[in-house]
From Swiss-Prot:
HAMAP family: ThiC. This is Phosphomethylpyrimidine synthase. The lineage of its organism: Bacteria, Bacillati, Bacillota, Bacilli, Bacillales. One of its GO terms (biological process) is thiamine biosynthetic process. GO terms for molecular function: 4 iron, 4 sulfur cluster binding; carbon-carbon lyase activity; zinc ion binding. It comes from Bacillus thuringiensis (strain Al Hakam). It is an enzyme of class 4 (lyase). The keyword Iron applies. Its EC number is 4.1.99.17.
Amino acid sequence: MKQSVSAEQIELKSSLPGSKKVYVDGPREGMKVPMREIEQSDTNGVPNPPIRVYDTSGPYTDPAYKVELEKGIPTPRHSWILERGDVEAYEGREVKPEDDGVKVASKHTPVFPQMDRKPLRAKQGANVTQMHYARNGIITSEMEYVAIREGVDPEFVRKEIAEGRAILPANINHPEAELMIIGRNFHVKVNANIGNSAVSSSIAEEVEKMTWATRWGADTIMDLSTGKNIHTTREWIIRNAPVPVGTVPIYQALEKVNGIAEDLTWEVYRDTLIEQAEQGVDYFTIHAGVLLRYIPITAKRTTGIVSRGGSIMAQWCLFHHKENFLYTHFEEICEIMKQYDVSFSLGDGLRPGSIADANDEAQFSELETLGELTKIAWKHDVQVMIEGPGHVPMHLIKENMEKELDICQGAPFYTLGPLTTDIAPGYDHITSAIGAAMIGWFGTAMLCYVTPKEHLGLPNKDDVREGVITYKIAAHAADLAKGHKTAHQRDDALSKARFEFRWRDQFNLSLDPERAMEYHDETLPAEGAKTAHFCSMCGPKFCSMRISHDIREYAKENDLETTEAIEKGMKEKAKEFKETGSHLYQ
């Protein structure tokens, strides 16, 4: 009897403290766009308005929703897809044991109950990509949805997609996803990588990591599984994922040929693309820019080729002494992508893996090829984003952004960090967040998170939380620097709460309320400390904000408005302060 993954096997948490799930009604019946509303307490009887923020947590934080992982989450978008009349349901390919990396299916594998569902594809001659609709002047329901999330006009969304500056990753077989957009003129997004390996993790653990990552703010998920049960793990994740899901198909294709790179073929890879597209993967990382002639250039590098996908294709090219089959079959890949609206994430297989290799000939040669491939994909109206480095010192980061925008005609940039130094294993979420904040400011549309386990091991769910929060900080800092019109509202609300000693509001407005309260309560755990006009850093006598309050009150009581009057008042106050023994609080 096949096993199942249940909600009891994983930890699911409700909404964050002081928050509640709310929905904004869209322009069409039944369209409800999720937001998180953070409540605030009053200031001396004067109400502070609730703050609404972008929410990626899906239905899991809705108290009215009953979690049943074996059924998957709701599919409100399904009707939008069908009503356009350009898709058809079909039998799909047969799921085989080798899809899960085994010769015989195991009775112990928790197969998703609805794996026999019929996938959708475009009807003969149709193109179902959001870019195709946008270029034909159509504002889809998906575009209207993301316009509400971003606080912009739907026509602006359509135009950005039509011109290739943004992508709306939305496979027609992933109707569970709550739509989002990736582009430099929108909020900077964060991706979280999850996935098993040959030596670690289970299906339940990966589903839990997905719900955990989205709770803390991951905008997309990449399933980078390389162990057994790849197909089944991905099915459980997609059916329960409220955010777009990306993959690197070459990983599964390699499993199908027993991990021997030189045995890879276009036919095996093509079959894998269709398999994953039928499941509902929203974007594929495809390392089509690793060309045979570029591989020798990497021989001079300190760390060679560090991309897993890049090294697989380099090994294949060298063994056969042939051009990369992902490059030679790129037009055929585009034909597959546009049948399902899978977006390209053109992989940087030659990204630098060390500071010494940053911005070298190999890296930028591949980027030139990615620019060429972008034009081909756009010819098919297939959505494209470009993957970027890697390990880059701060003074070389801006050049990466400028070259990408120029060479790839403004396609969204999606970067891994970049890490700004190589000397901090165990802290690479910090070394990379520095670079991520900078490159986000310069124009990167999505940041791929790095966890503290980078270069050391497979991250657990606590590492996922740390990585997501760290990168949400970087993304938000970039939004502030770019002048995003709503970015500062949460900062202003938290600053006001801090100055007014509304401790619970400070916690609740933060990116990680639980961590903030935990640190505060380590030294001041009493409930009364939540209303105290000091914290344990300065204590009651040296709190700068409390002193500022005293100064304001003094100015108000003495009707001091001009600089001259304030200086006079300060002299009087200084005299009084000395006469009372130099004590701040009596």
